């Protein structure tokens, strides 16, 4: 199956400084994996997900990630990957275009929002 990104509807989430496209998702494709294209221009909530492992791939731009309580804040840029094991709190900010992949697939409501650390 070929999925043309320009045929996937964009969703604006201005309260989160994000625009996204849910390219591969459990409702239409597979419960095993989800892939979302995202452009962010600000801060992403501190969250934890007990259901899935998550990988971020930064396509372009730059930002900062904190993965784990008390972990160092690390810079990321185009070409970098960030792995988030399930059950690990994290947050990030920046001006980036990235892909986020979840295994198993992301389910709405599965992220628990935590108090901000960055």
Model-derived regions: residue spans:
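Short, surface-exposed beta-strand-loop junctions and turns on beta-sheet-rich folds
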Residues: 55, 71-73, 98-99, 107
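Histidine-centered divalent metal-coordination motifs
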Residues: 47-50, 90
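A short, N-terminal "cap"/entry segment at the start of jelly-roll beta-barrel domains
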Residues: 1-34, 39-47, 113-118
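A short hydrophobic beta-strand segment most commonly corresponding to one strand
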Residues: 32, 95-113
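Short, conserved beta-strand element in jelly-roll/cupin
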Residues: 37-40, 49-67
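Short acidic-glycine-tyrosine-enriched beta hairpin
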Residues: 70-87
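Short, surface-exposed secondary-structure boundary micro-motifs
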Residues: 87-88, 93
């Amino acid at each position: 199956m070929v999925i043309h990104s320009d045929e996937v509807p964009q969703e604006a989430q201005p309260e989160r400084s994000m625009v996204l496209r849910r390219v591969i998702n459990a409702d239409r494709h597979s419960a095993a994996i989800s892939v979302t294209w995202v452009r962010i221009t600000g801060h992403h909530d501190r969250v934890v997900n007990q259901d899935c492992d998550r990988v971020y791939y930064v396509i372009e731009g730059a930002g900062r990630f904190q993965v784990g309580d008390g972990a160092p804040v690390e810079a990321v840029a185009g070409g970098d990957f960030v792995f988030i094991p399930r059950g690990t709190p994290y947050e990030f900010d920046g001006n980036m275009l990235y892909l986020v992949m979840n295994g198993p697939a992301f389910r709405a409501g599965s992220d628990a929002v935590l108090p901000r650390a960055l």
